[in-house]
Amino acid sequence: MAHRDIDDTGRAGERTDRAAGRQQGTAPDEEPQPLSPTAARDLFADRAPLGLVRLFEASVPLVLDGEPVEDEERMHADLAGPLHLTPLGRGDDTVLAAFTDRTAMLEAVRREDTAYEELSPEQVEQARASAKKICVSNPTALDARVCFFEDAGEQGDVKCLGPELGYPNLSRLPRGFLGTQNWNDVISSLSWCRFDVSLFDAFDWQGNEFFAPKGCTTPDLSRFGWGDRTASIVNWGS
């Protein structure tokens, strides 16, 4: 299915008093909210406990703080707080790596950054056609916006988000030709982006975090248990 571009990306504003304003009311809100320079620190300083637990049920192995997870239900029962998750590894060795500490997650991602190789255009197209995660060694050549899609493989309705911007409540972002639907629990794939992107499974950038590193494709979020799960999103702009 060909995608329908309904993008109307805003620019980062000058509000620096907080990460972004909390959503009020139920009226549609098509404008993304600007992030403050300290947003990454502020948003993760005091994470709310998880409410109803929804299993990831990823099709790749799940690893928690470096240890394989055999029983995901038991893992959630033993943990009170949200997790920070990201794909690590290549090809058949890819895992969904979960961390209780966000700094540890970022360190693991950056270690993997140094192992990326330069791909030829032919290799890039072959890899993208396979719907597997691939990463480029020079993400600065990519678009600063991230585009998120209704379906896997960058198909279906699409909306794009510029750097240093976020949507704290995707249920208020209209979707579809008539704008009668919304983006909550809909996102199934992401485009390549120059910057890091985070998805959250609760409003106001709370809940579990799925971290999509800059320069990497995310053609099928369901592979990592994140298909139709995202409630809020951030393009970090760095």
Please state what every model-predicted region is:
Residues 2-238:
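Compact beta-sheet-dominated domain cores in extracellular/mature segments
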